[in-house]
Curated annotation (Swiss-Prot):
Name recorded for this polypeptide: Kinetochore protein Nuf2
Protein's organism: Danio rerio
Chief localisation class: nucleus
Protein family according to the UniProt entry: Belongs to the NUF2 family.
The protein's role, per its UniProt record: Acts as a component of the essential kinetochore-associated NDC80 complex, which is required for chromosome segregation and spindle checkpoint activity.
Subcellular location: Nucleus; Chromosome, Centromere, Kinetochore
Domain of life: Eukaryota
One Gene Ontology biological process: heart development
Keywords: Cell cycle, Cell division, Centromere, Chromosome, Coiled coil, Kinetochore, Mitosis, Nucleus
Subunit structure: Component of the NDC80 complex, which is composed of ndc80, cdca1, spbc24 and spbc25.
Gene Ontology molecular function: microtubule binding; protein-containing complex binding
């Protein structure tokens, strides 16, 4: 275990694994623990290696016995006995490095040792476990890939159907293209008008904001003037109490004060008028906004009514088409009814005439049928005679085939005997040649001895 990179299993585990996973049928039944311990049997080990190669590489056992040489070779039996062992050895040398076994030799096939065979078989078992796990994982990946492909195909189909539906919904039929163009132009005009009105409303709102700022400034100025007037009145009352002036100066001061009061009143009146104008403008702006909102609502109602009228027009057109088709069908049905009535009267006349003709034809046919039955009886008798002849021919052919089969079997037996005789002759000739060679060698040796003796 310290040298190997794989676990060495027990003999019972190895036997059970190879019986269930590698071998099949009678081979799995006959493969036991005695084939590996105490001394492994070379035939069973070689057969097991062949089955492993068949499982992994689809290399059947009969393929090992094919001799890759020309037909005209001397003693092909020697090659036939040696070819499968060398083929298994070459294939195992190529395969076992994958299982982390690098020192496989011919002695492991011809004269296997227990410890060595157990390590090799446990290495192969470890690789087969790994292979099984990888196959399960790849099968799971393939199933998931197939499911994903099915989903993708379903999604592509749904996408194509959705695209077709979108095309149907977006494309306007030629009958409604003129109406659609008119509606589009009307909508464009409405949108331009609404934009202009929105611009006017925004301009009015800006003016209203300016007026509001002006009103605020004027109100501030008014408050300041009122404060100034109050301060001036206080100062005047103080000055009156402190200073006693001349009547002329008082008159002048009073006139000045009156002029200033008049000016203040005039400015106040102007400010009030301006305020009233601005309030009127604000009211007008609010009225304009309300009117614009009403217009927008009317436009929306108009669009909804246009769509409803369009739907109703389509329904009316479809109903008109249905009405026309029904009227046409009614006309065709009425004409067909008249034609059928005429045809019925004609048919009744024809049937009465045909009934008489049929009766006459029936009498003629009955006579013909009687004649045909007589001919059929004669033909049936002839047919039975022919069937008997065919059965006799079939019996003769069957007997002939049986004779042919017996002759073929006899020929095969004779050819087998001839082949056996030929093989015996070959073996005897080989033995005879060997004996002659031995005799020649012995005679040569005797001659040499005689020469040396003389």
């Amino acid at each position: 275990m310290s040298e190997n990179t794989f676990p060495v299993y027990k003999v019972d585990v190895i036997v059970q694994f190879y019986r269930t996973e590698v071998l099949t049928g009678q081979e799995s039944k006959h493969f036991t623990k005695n084939d590996l311990t105490p001394t492994p049997k070379p035939e069973s080990v070689q057969r097991l290696y062949m089955r492993i190669l068949q499982l992994l590489f689809r290399f059947r056992p009969e393929c090992h016995y094919t001799v890759p040489l020309s037909e005209n070779i001397q003693y092909p039996m020697l090659y036939e006995s040696f070819a499968p062992i060398m083929s298994v050895y070459m294939r195992m040398c190529q395969f076992l490095p994958v299982c982390r076994v690098y020192d496989f030799s011919l002695s492991d096939l011809l004269n296997p040792k227990t410890k060595r065979t157990i390590t090799i078989l446990s290495a192969i078992q470890n690789f087969l476990h790994f292979r099984k796990q990888r196959l399960e994982i790849t099968a799971a990946h393939q199933q998931s890939f197939r499911a994903d492909m099915d989903r993708l195909q379903a999604y592509t189909r749904e996408i194509k159907e959705a695209e077709k539906k979108i095309e149907k919904l977006t494309t306007i039929p030629p009958e409604q293209q003129a109406e659609a163009k008119e509606l589009a132009s009307a909508l464009a005009e409405l949108s331009t008008n609404t934009q202009h009105e929105y611009q006017d409303v925004s301009a009015i709102n800006e003016k209203v904001a300016q007026f509001k700022t002006e009103i605020a400034e004027l109100s501030q100025k008014l408050t300041q003037r009122k404060v100034e007037v109050a301060t001036l009145k206080d100062e005047i009352s103080k000055l009156k109490s402190q200073i006693v002036e001349s009547p002329e100066e008082l008159k002048n001061e009073m006139e000045r004060m009156r002029e200033t009061a008049k000016n203040i009143k005039m400015s106040k009146e102007l400010a009030d008028e301006r305020l009233v104008e601005l309030q009127m403008l604000v009211q007008c702006a609010s009225q304009v906004e309300a009117e614009i909102q009403i217009l927008l609502k009317q436009l929306q109602d108009l669009q909804s009514s246009m769509s409803k009228t369009k739907q109703r027009k389509e329904e009316v057109q479809s109903l008109e088409v249905m009405n026309e088709s029904l009227q046409k069908e009614l006309k065709s049905l009425s004409s067909e009814e008249a034609q059928l009535k005429r045809a019925l009267t004609m048919k009744l006349d024809k049937e009465s005439k045909q009934q008489i003709r049929r009766q006459k034809k029936k009498e003629v046919k009955d006579q013909q049928v009687k004649n045909i039955y007589g001919q059929y009886d004669k033909m049936h008798q002839k047919r039975q005679e022919i069937v008997k002849k065919i059965e006799e021919c079939n019996r003769e052919t069957k007997q002939f085939k049986e004779k042919m089969q017996a002759l073929r079997e006899n020929c095969n037996q004779r050819t087998q005997k001839a082949q056996e005789i030929y093989e015996r002759l070959l073996t005897t000739l080989e033995q005879y040649h060997k004996r002659i060679e031995k005799i020649l060698v012995e005679t040569n040796a005797d001659a040499l001895k005689m020469k040396s003796h003389f």
